[in-house]
């Protein structure tokens, strides 16, 4: 209907800016990664710019998620090293999505049951924050077990962005996402003052 269409066209995703980033964001120095005989990469070198949006593109199984896991210190490179700047605060949106109680509502999960949530040093009305991810009044009361793939992605985005990172690691954030949410996410990233690294297979 017309109301829904207008609401979707106006959809905005608000990405809170985390603490100010210094000059050193994330650097890879001669990084290699292999599992047994299977080499994912060798001699990987890069330096992320403080206000960049960087895409990591490649088919499944080429080590894109492994790269994020190494940046976060969850996995060790086979050789070489990563340097993460002292001002970096990571926020990670992953493919697997951490487990969420299917019986809780969207609002309960994102707000933690509080009327106000802290974004950095400012308080924000929890319902208004949830609404910024295209969950209207009725949608906020939906049980998480009943969400579509796109809605689940928006829920995880809202949770991760609440952490107020200044470096966003987005692992396939566009899977199952509708075109309006995708456009809103792209606009949100353009207005984001930090650095974003987006994994995609296309």
Summary of predicted features, one role per range:
Residues 1-2, 163:
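Intrinsically disordered, low-complexity boundary segments flanking structured domains
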Residues 18-202:
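ABC ATP-binding cassette signature C-motif
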Residues 3-27:
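ABC-family P-loop ATPase nucleotide-binding domain
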